[in-house]
Amino acid sequence: MKNLNGRTHNACYHPYYHQSLHFAQQQQQQQQHHLQQQQQHMQQQQQQQQAPQQQLRHQQRQLPTQPAYQQSQSVAHNAFPLRSSSNNYGHVASSAYAASSGSHNSNNAAAMAAVCQMQNFFNQQQQQQQQLEFNNNCMPINYYQQQQQQHYPSESQSSASGWNPETPGQAQLALTATTCNTTAAATCNTTAAATTSTTATSAAAGSDNNHSDNFAMDASEIATFLANELFLQQLGNFETGQSVLTLTTPTLTPTTTRNIEDTLGHLLSDTQTDRVAGCAGFAVPKVLPNAIDVLGMGIPTGVSSLPLQQTFDLSLGQGSESEDSNASYNDTQMNEEQDTTDTSSAHTDSTSYQAGHIMAGSVNGGGVNNFSNVLAAVSSSRGSASVGSSNANTSNTPARRGGGRRPNRSTNMTPEEEQKRAVRRERNKQAAARCRKRRVDQTNELTEEVEQLEKRGESMRKEIEVLTNSKNQLEYLLATHRATCQKIRSDMLSVVTCNGLIAPAGLLSAGSSGSGASSHHNHNSNDSSNGTITGMDATLNSTGRSNSPLDLKPAANIDSLLMHIKDEPLDGAIDSGSSLDQDGPPPSKRITLPPMSTMPHVHLSTILTPTGASSGSLQTPITSTAPGGFGSAFPVTSNGSSINNINSIGNNMNSPTLNAHNKVPKERPNTLAFQRPLGQMHLTMANNKAGGPTQIQGVPIQTPSTGTFNFDSLMDGGTGLTPVSGPLVPNSSSTNKHPLELPTPTAEPSKLVSL
């Protein structure tokens, strides 16, 4: 994560870190006071063993004070003065403060204590023998602690003779060495950084000393001292209640580990000749593979067990408290972004940023943790080979690609290469922008297409709903209309007429095919239809009286119908208000007919006026047998119904069927056609005598006293035989028809009764 200035992400949490340091300031001061008292106590013990050195130690105890330290820090603040004739301690303090100015007042006391301790070391080394020092450096630290605990007098004698180890607390040093192994991930980074900075500072101070030939301070002692300081700094952060996980403390990185290996590893393998050759008493570090082990167990015996003190990070600059982790990130991410696109504004080169704030005098331009530049500058008088090895170790770090976005800009990159990289980055930015735009456009097009399809689908769904509702309404109307529909349904018969007569069921197909010819040839008929009756309603074809349709309803029970017929006397005059009288002409136009027995074959033209004999009543009984002339002309069909053909010109039509090819124009009949009801009517003779009354289902049949003709029927071309009195034989047709539509001889001749 980068902040707005392109700095390291740890700078974002800078206030929290200083707050934790501010909370730890009081504890640091208390520990420093305690350590100073402990130092004084140990120095008193050493004065008893080393009487000649007591006065020197007394002077050393008075040297570094807080005001003097603050005055000397303004002398050299931003650089490491390696060669100068100014105050030695002022340079040491100012260098330490320049590296740790980000830690505010809490690091001032720690730096003061560190300077005091180093001054004690410097003065002690002037009176020590380097051979014993080398022997002590080769001993393990644990063995050294055991020797100090078990053989303190003998160790003190050896210290008096050559090497003077200050032993303020062996248990504390052991705790430090042990804890460095357990908490290496949290402390080794700051340990190495502080070790390097203070080592370089003390080396610079030692090189300025006039007695540099006799001065030979062991670098491992300084490293151990700073390790204790840094460990207690981390421990103080824990004690203040601030969690280390939330703070931006430096972490252990590969660069930090390598630097620790370089420094401490070479200190273990240092020789007397190298120590003599180097003015500061140590040589250029070399790479060793075990850094953590060196920190934990490999610290030489000559390391002074310094007092426990809350430490400070000497390698931090003003800009950030974690520049070392930033530099290690840069080392591992060398040249990461050469072929990538970086659109962020935080493309600041971190190495140059660090060099501007911390390593202003650096030659090789490495990061903060690459403190071998300082060591190379200190040992610049030693030889070009050592300096070359240092440069090879620091500036020629191989690139490690482990992810991330911030690259390390190479220091030796030419302006042309930088310009090419900038152009390449701009091209990548433009290409990425075009790619994003294409994706956005494609997404928008697909979205619009989807919206159109959704709208179309919605409209289709609405249309389907409308059509479904319409279909349901039509089905409902059809279902409700079917119960009251007057048209014939598909399961009913189709009736065909021929010359106004109804054809039998056997010729329905022929009649339907010849219905057109029937309507053209039948000029004398009153047929107003096209020859086919397609309905159940009797009023469809009732315009002509000679074309009454066939009632297709099933025949009701005649016996039950006859029981409801009212028995009325038929001898008297017919009431003008009767239903039968309404069908004929008025009484003034009616003519009387003579009895049928006197004129069986009288032509209609001979009937002019009623005769006197016609006044008598007609008591002609109905015989049980039909006349011989009617038998062949009106045969009885198998279903109990008969078809009567009127033949008045001698052309007998004996065929039981009628079709359109056998039509003959109708003429006025001169006889009354009578058909005895068979099958549907059960005639019972009361007696077989002539003139006996005939009964139909127990009802006597009587003829009227005077038979009358229907004058209107005669004028219309009919037979004029419309009955005006007398009981008619009830049938299914007469029970359902309107009184104006009673049977006529042309329509249903079989339903007439002889008068």
UniProtKB/Swiss-Prot annotation:
<dbReference type="GO" id="GO:0040013">
    <property type="term" value="P:negative regulation of locomotion"/>
</dbReference>
<comment type="function">
    <text>Developmentally regulated transcription factor AP-1 binds and recognizes the enhancer DNA sequence: 5'-TGA[CG]TCA-3'. May play a role in the function or determination of a particular subset of cells in the developing embryo. It is able to carry out its function either independently of or in conjunction with Jra.</text>
</comment>
<dbReference type="GO" id="GO:0001228">
    <property type="term" value="F:DNA-binding transcription activator activity, RNA polymerase II-specific"/>
</dbReference>
<dbReference type="GO" id="GO:0046529">
    <property type="term" value="P:imaginal disc fusion, thorax closure"/>
</dbReference>
<dbReference type="GO" id="GO:0005654">
    <property type="term" value="C:nucleoplasm"/>
</dbReference>
<dbReference type="GO" id="GO:0035976">
    <property type="term" value="C:transcription factor AP-1 complex"/>
</dbReference>
<dbReference type="InterPro" id="IPR046347">
    <property type="entry name" value="bZIP_sf"/>
</dbReference>
<feature type="compositionally biased region" description="Low complexity">
    <location>
        <begin position="510"/>
        <end position="531"/>
    </location>
</feature>
<feature type="compositionally biased region" description="Low complexity">
    <location>
        <begin position="383"/>
        <end position="397"/>
    </location>
</feature>
<dbReference type="GO" id="GO:0000086">
    <property type="term" value="P:G2/M transition of mitotic cell cycle"/>
</dbReference>
<feature type="modified residue" description="Phosphoserine">
    <location>
        <position position="548"/>
    </location>
</feature>
<feature type="region of interest" description="Disordered">
    <location>
        <begin position="510"/>
        <end position="552"/>
    </location>
</feature>
<dbReference type="GO" id="GO:0016330">
    <property type="term" value="P:second mitotic wave involved in compound eye morphogenesis"/>
</dbReference>
<protein>
    <recommendedName>
        <fullName>Transcription factor kayak, isoforms A/B/F</fullName>
    </recommendedName>
</protein>
<feature type="region of interest" description="Disordered">
    <location>
        <begin position="23"/>
        <end position="75"/>
    </location>
</feature>
<feature type="compositionally biased region" description="Low complexity">
    <location>
        <begin position="23"/>
        <end position="66"/>
    </location>
</feature>
<dbReference type="GO" id="GO:0009611">
    <property type="term" value="P:response to wounding"/>
</dbReference>
<dbReference type="GO" id="GO:0042060">
    <property type="term" value="P:wound healing"/>
</dbReference>
<keyword id="KW-0804">Transcription</keyword>
<feature type="region of interest" description="Disordered">
    <location>
        <begin position="316"/>
        <end position="350"/>
    </location>
</feature>
<dbReference type="GO" id="GO:0005737">
    <property type="term" value="C:cytoplasm"/>
</dbReference>
<dbReference type="Pfam" id="PF00170">
    <property type="entry name" value="bZIP_1"/>
</dbReference>
<dbReference type="GO" id="GO:0048674">
    <property type="term" value="P:collateral sprouting of injured axon"/>
</dbReference>
<dbReference type="GO" id="GO:0035220">
    <property type="term" value="P:wing disc development"/>
</dbReference>
<feature type="region of interest" description="Disordered">
    <location>
        <begin position="383"/>
        <end position="440"/>
    </location>
</feature>
<dbReference type="GO" id="GO:0045944">
    <property type="term" value="P:positive regulation of transcription by RNA polymerase II"/>
</dbReference>
<feature type="compositionally biased region" description="Polar residues">
    <location>
        <begin position="316"/>
        <end position="333"/>
    </location>
</feature>
<feature type="region of interest" description="Leucine-zipper">
    <location>
        <begin position="446"/>
        <end position="453"/>
    </location>
</feature>
<feature type="domain" description="bZIP">
    <location>
        <begin position="418"/>
        <end position="481"/>
    </location>
</feature>
<dbReference type="GO" id="GO:0046982">
    <property type="term" value="F:protein heterodimerization activity"/>
</dbReference>
<keyword id="KW-0539">Nucleus</keyword>
<dbReference type="GO" id="GO:0006964">
    <property type="term" value="P:positive regulation of biosynthetic process of antibacterial peptides active against Gram-negative bacteria"/>
</dbReference>
<dbReference type="GO" id="GO:1903688">
    <property type="term" value="P:positive regulation of border follicle cell migration"/>
</dbReference>
<keyword id="KW-0238">DNA-binding</keyword>
<dbReference type="GO" id="GO:0006357">
    <property type="term" value="P:regulation of transcription by RNA polymerase II"/>
</dbReference>
<dbReference type="GO" id="GO:0007464">
    <property type="term" value="P:R3/R4 cell fate commitment"/>
</dbReference>
<keyword id="KW-0597">Phosphoprotein</keyword>
<dbReference type="GO" id="GO:0045475">
    <property type="term" value="P:locomotor rhythm"/>
</dbReference>
<dbReference type="GO" id="GO:0061057">
    <property type="term" value="P:peptidoglycan recognition protein signaling pathway"/>
</dbReference>
<keyword id="KW-0010">Activator</keyword>
<feature type="compositionally biased region" description="Low complexity">
    <location>
        <begin position="341"/>
        <end position="350"/>
    </location>
</feature>
<feature type="region of interest" description="Disordered">
    <location>
        <begin position="716"/>
        <end position="755"/>
    </location>
</feature>
